[in-house]
């Protein structure tokens, strides 16, 4: 893996793929959010952004992942393992994982495979879990419809540290007109502001 480099940041953060400089991952921070930028990290494959900063005097790390269609669980697990030292209790991992994390995340209710189990084990070891599933353990709502398979799934996720769950008020799946995926909206308790994430 090539060495990553911290570089100055702006209010719009994106990675560019090699093909026609196509943007693969983008993170937009609203001007209404009191976000103080510190640094940004991009990986060579243009599928990950790690954004460091502060909101309302609290540190926050946003890890935005766009996983490949094939081998997504293994890819995400490798990212988490390679950059474990950069991930702490102030980190929120978001993005299109291109994989469900549980049986509830599939309309077919098909069991998850061993690679997803392994990814979940890694998250558990890091004390991270699916924020949406923590608030809605039995609710079957989805973020993506596959016209090829005729099935719905929740492949877009927000993952947070267990110690940070108390900071969040609610999380919901919302419609999006700029993507073929639905978005996720995370609302913090009164000290903070609303977070809204959707795949562009």
Regions found by a protein language model. Give the residues of each.
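A shared catalytic/ligand-binding motif for oxyanion handling
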Residues: 1-200
């Amino acid at each position: 893996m090539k060495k990553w480099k911290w570089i100055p940041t702006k209010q719009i953060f994106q990675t560019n793929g090699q093909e026609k400089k196509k943007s693969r991952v983008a993170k937009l921070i609203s001007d209404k959010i009191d976000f103080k930028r510190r640094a940004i990290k991009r990986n060579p494959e243009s599928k990950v952004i790690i954004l460091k900063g502060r909101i309302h005097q609290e540190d926050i790390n946003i890890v935005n992942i766009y996983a490949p269609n094939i081998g997504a669980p293994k890819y995400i697990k490798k990212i988490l393992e390679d950059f474990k030292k950069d991930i702490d209790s102030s980190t929120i991992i978001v993005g299109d994982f291109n994989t469900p994390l549980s049986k509830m995340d599939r309309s077919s209710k098909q069991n998850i495979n061993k690679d997803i189990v392994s990814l979940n084990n890694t998250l558990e070891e890091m004390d991270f879990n699916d924020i949406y599933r923590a608030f809605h353990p039995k609710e079957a709502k989805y973020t993506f419809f596959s016209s090829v398979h005729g099935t719905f799934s929740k492949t877009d996720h927000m993952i947070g540290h267990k110690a940070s769950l108390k900071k969040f008020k609610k999380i919901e799946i919302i419609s999006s007109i700029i993507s073929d995926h639905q978005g996720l909206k995370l609302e913090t308790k009164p000290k903070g502001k609303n977070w809204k994430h959707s795949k562009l």
